[in-house]
């Protein structure tokens, strides 16, 4: 059944036979789908929009930040994934923590996280951000940024390559796609 036939059928019969309850039926029994209507949930629509427009707040603390800049450069070009780096936490929905988090910087990290609008996600990039890394036994290092902010995706490596960060961003997009946004 083509679009023209569907429009022609609607013009001849302006009141469709389907009711609101027809949306809840399985796809095979749904008369709205047979007439050419597409139904979706608000969750799926919002998650689709969020996966295509992730705006990360960069929180580069050490050498991993260089790889994060490399991922945004021309060779990998995160713009084609809808990732645009933002300088302000109020404009971003993703925070990339890249590098060694020390005790003095932990309150600043939490403050930036609290300033981000909901829903918000965090990517922990590198061994130092994941668990302290090389400086794990130092008295001044936080042993993982997940002790300060909730982390959604961990990117391993010392430093992780830019390709690993892109893979982590793609994994976060998959996680956002599966999230129930309204119930979150």
From Swiss-Prot:
Source domain of life: Bacteria
Keywords for this protein: 4Fe-4S, Cell membrane, Iron, Iron-sulfur, Membrane, Metal-binding, NAD, Quinone, Translocase, Transport, Ubiquinone
Gene3D superfamilies, sorted: 3.40.50.12280
Catalytic activity: a quinone + NADH + 5 H(+)(in) = a quinol + NAD(+) + 4 H(+)(out)
Subcellular locations according to the entry: Cell membrane
Biological process per Gene Ontology, one example term: electron transport coupled proton transport
GO molecular function: 4 iron, 4 sulfur cluster binding; iron ion binding; NADH dehydrogenase (ubiquinone) activity; NADH:ubiquinone reductase (non-electrogenic) activity; quinone binding
Cofactor(s) essential for the protein: [4Fe-4S] cluster
Positions bound to [4Fe-4S] cluster: 63-64, 128, 158
EC class (word): translocase
Repeat in keyword set: no
GO CC, alphabetical: plasma membrane; respiratory chain complex I
Pfam families: Oxidored_q6
Free-text remark on how the cofactor is bound: Binds 1 [4Fe-4S] cluster.
Topology class, membrane: Peripheral membrane protein
UniProt feature coiled coil, ranges: none
Keyword hit for NAD: yes
NCBIfam families cross-referenced by the UniProt entry: nuoB_fam, PRK06411.1
Assembly, per entry: NDH-1 is composed of 14 different subunits. Subunits NuoB, C, D, E, F, and G constitute the peripheral sector of the complex.
Family note: Belongs to the complex I 20 kDa subunit family.
Function: NDH-1 shuttles electrons from NADH, via FMN and iron-sulfur (Fe-S) centers, to quinones in the respiratory chain. Couples the redox reaction to proton translocation (for every two electrons transferred, four hydrogen ions are translocated across the cytoplasmic membrane), and thus conserves the redox energy in a proton gradient.
Protein name (database record): NADH-quinone oxidoreductase subunit B
């Amino acid at each position: 059944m083509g679009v023209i036939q569907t429009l022609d059928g609607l013009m001849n019969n302006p009141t469709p036979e389907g009711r609101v309850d027809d949306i809840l039926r399985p796809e095979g029994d749904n008369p709205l789908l047979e007439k050419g209507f597409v139904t979706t949930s608000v969750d799926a629509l919002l998650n689709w929009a969020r996966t295509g427009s992730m705006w990360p707040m960069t929180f580069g603390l050490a050498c991993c930040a260089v790889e994060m800049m490399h991922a945004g450069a021309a060779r990998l070009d995160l713009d084609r994934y809808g990732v645009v780096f933002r300088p302000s936490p109020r404009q971003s929905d993703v925070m990339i923590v890249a590098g060694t988090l020390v005790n003095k910087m932990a309150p600043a990290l939490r403050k930036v996280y609290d300033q981000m609008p909901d829903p918000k996600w965090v990517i922990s990039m590198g061994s130092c951000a994941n668990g302290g890394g090389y400086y794990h036994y130092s008295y001044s290092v936080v042993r993982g940024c997940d002790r300060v902010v909730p982390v959604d995706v961990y990117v391993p490596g010392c430093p992780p390559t830019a390709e690993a960060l892109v893979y982590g961003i793609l994994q976060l997009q998959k996680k956002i796609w599966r999230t129930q946004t309204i119930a979150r």
